Amino acid sequence: MNQIYIEDVDLGDDVGPLVLEPTRDQLDAFTKVWGTSVGRFTSDEVAKSEGFTGVILPGNMSMAFLGQLLTGWCGYEGKLRRLDVDFRRSIQPGDKLNCTGIITDIEVVGQ
């Protein structure tokens, strides 16, 4: 992993990709650690009753994948201070995710 510094970053730079395919086992482990038992994340039956085709991943699990993308990109000394996310659809175990980002703002803090 290369270390990225603010001087190396320009508006419009691409980040990624990080390609993932979350599994049901990962979802079950995540919801267990998170401490939730919300049906749409744990039960196909409940998820279907809410209009989904099966269980879905919680938004914070999706955001964790994006955090993984960004912290892997910026290196050990990098700091992720804010992450803005637009959720466009639900994600289910087995979906192939192509996580990418675009630098839209640069703010130097502490100088």
What are these regions (language model features)?
Residues 40-46, 80-82, 110-111:
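Glycine-rich loops and low-complexity Gly/Arg-rich segments
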Residues 6-7, 34, 41-42, 71, ...:
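Intrinsically disordered, low-complexity segments enriched in polar/charged residues with Gly/Pro
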Residues 1-15, 90-111:
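HotDog/MaoC-like acyl-thioester-processing domains
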Residues 1-55:
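Catalytic strand-loop segment that frames the active site of acyl-thioester-processing enzymes
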Residues 20-21, 67, 109:
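Residue-level structural signal for beta-strand termini and adjacent loop
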Residues 49-104:
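Hydrophobic beta-strand-centered segment that forms part of the acyl-chain substrate-binding groove
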